[in-house]
Amino acid sequence: MDFFYPNWLNDFWRIMGLIFLGGKQALEAEGEKRFDQEKVIRFATEHGLAFFDTAQKVCRTKDNASDQFLEIQEPTDVGSLLSHIPSCTQVVTTGGKASEELLVQTDAGAIPAVGTCTICHIGPRKIRWWRMPSTSRAYPMKIERKAEHYRMIFQSEDFPKADSGR
């Protein structure tokens, strides 16, 4: 996988297109059922987006993409990861398993409700932690509503305005 969310059936890049580029097809390869990798990478770079998993090693206990069948064998040390990204002020989780893993690495008392955030520390860093709806089409929410949730991240006071495309 050369970039995050390459699956044609996942709506993450369509949501970004709706928020920033005037339409959900903006990051698709014209006339093809795939996302344009060059457009995606350029967009993520221009908007200061970085991606990483909360697990380095996982085991699927069943042949199913659901979090309930995912066992984290080696979690990512998110505090260490953030030490290499000093300008990062916000972290987003979408899945339940990722949120559960991040919770144990923070001083947050609970996982934020979907569509909300909390201020917490990951290691010594003060971070705004957002819990967003899954961009999978299996998650029962219209893409436009998901985009409304994600738009809040980019409108928050912590998001770097110079790189946000506004």
Identify the residue ranges that each predicted region occupies:
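Short, mixed-charge, low-aromatic patches
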Residues: K33-E38, E101-G109
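Short, surface-exposed acidic-centric catalytic microdomains
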Residues: D2-L70
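Generic structural signal for beta-strand residues in well-ordered domains
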Residues: R42-A44, H84, I122
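Secondary-structure boundary/capping positions in well-ordered alpha/beta enzyme cores
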Residues: G23, C88-T89, G109
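C-terminal capping/extension of enzyme domains
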Residues: P6-W8, I15, K62-G79, L103-R166
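Internal catalytic-core helix/loop-beta-alpha segment
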Residues: E46-Q105
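Alpha-helix initiation/capping motif
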Residues: N10, D36, G95-G96, K142
